[in-house]
Amino acid sequence: MLKQIQKFLKLEAASGILLLVSALLAMIFANTDLNQLYFSFLQTEVAIKFGAFSIDKPLLMWVNDGFMAVFFILVGMEVKRELFEGSLSSYQKAIFPAVAALGGMIIPALVYWFINQNSPEYQQGWAIPMATDIAFALGIVALLSKQVPPALKVFLLALAIIDDLGAIIVIALFFSHEMSMQALTIASIAIVILVAMNRYKVTGLINYAIIGTILWASVLKSGVHATLAGVIIGFCIPLRGKNGEAPLHHLEHALAPWCSFAILPLFAFSNAGVSLEGMSLDKLASPLPLGVALGLIIGKPVGVFLFSYVAVLLGIAKVPEGINLKQIFAIAVLCGIGFTMSMFIAGLAFGEEDASESVLALARLGILMGTFVAAIIGYFLLKITTKPSLMKAA
């Protein structure tokens, strides 16, 4: 049994499968006799006190603000590595996925806005369909890994990383609350220390853990979303130490399995549980879920492919060697898998509203519908466009 579990965890598609199972379990818990247990568990108050300082939040918020900050440390490190050494380390490498990612952020937001232009109570959800769930999308690609060109995987990874960077900027600019200057001052001091540690190539990760925890707590109290602390910590981990060590590489490899097999599935289980009680076709077709779903199903592929095609047409970028535009379109459809990142932004957009439960439930249903359709269509398009016979013809 243990060998079978270890074999499963080594599969490229394992993290995507686990996310799907976690979401399905959440839906089962939320729509059966277990619903009271599920929702009351997520609202269990958990407090941490240190002298006069205290953080007292429901378990759901600890998952979204705490554990997800660890995931964003990983995101920060991935972005840094790709910018300095990887698929985004030069203009020629970065421009094609960057333009594609830009389209994949702008068009879904416009689709959502167009559908919700007469519903002012829903308009703050415009950023929800901008996101791509890289773990889920790569999980789908991994199901066809033997026939998918390596360059196509690199394109998806680079696009998703830039997409994450865009989501981080959106969160920082549009989803921060009233600021606490005292907390921001402490956060600023922590950032200066982290930057100095990076500058002088301090490689002891315990130092980053201590200062990073102070940064996270102060950012949480400041009104800026706490997960941004994770990104800053990730960026401040040195690529190389004075003696040739690779702290970023080591920490990235240490955190990746925890994020893939614990944090993201826990986030999916905590956020995907939507009660369908009282739901009707009218509600499902209302502007909020419709805007989110169509933003992911139509906005994402149109944005990614259109911007890519125009960039090639104008000579701004070139299609990476070994892949073609048909395959780019298949990947563009897979980018409509918003899932965990879209759920995260939905919680920021509607989590503070008085009617948050019903509104947030509608947003999450839109995400689940859009993600499911994008995953199914994207899988079959990728399977068709990467067939060996078609690859030779291209």
From Swiss-Prot:
GO BP term (any one): regulation of pH
Subcellular location field: Cell inner membrane
A Pfam family annotated for this UniProt entry: Na_H_antiport_1
The protein's name: Na(+)/H(+) antiporter NhaA
Signal peptide start-end: none
Transmembrane segments: 11-31, 59-79, 95-115, 125-145, 155-175, 177-197, 203-220, 254-274, 296-316, 328-348, 365-385
Recorded GO CC terms: plasma membrane
Gene Ontology MF, one: sodium:proton antiporter activity
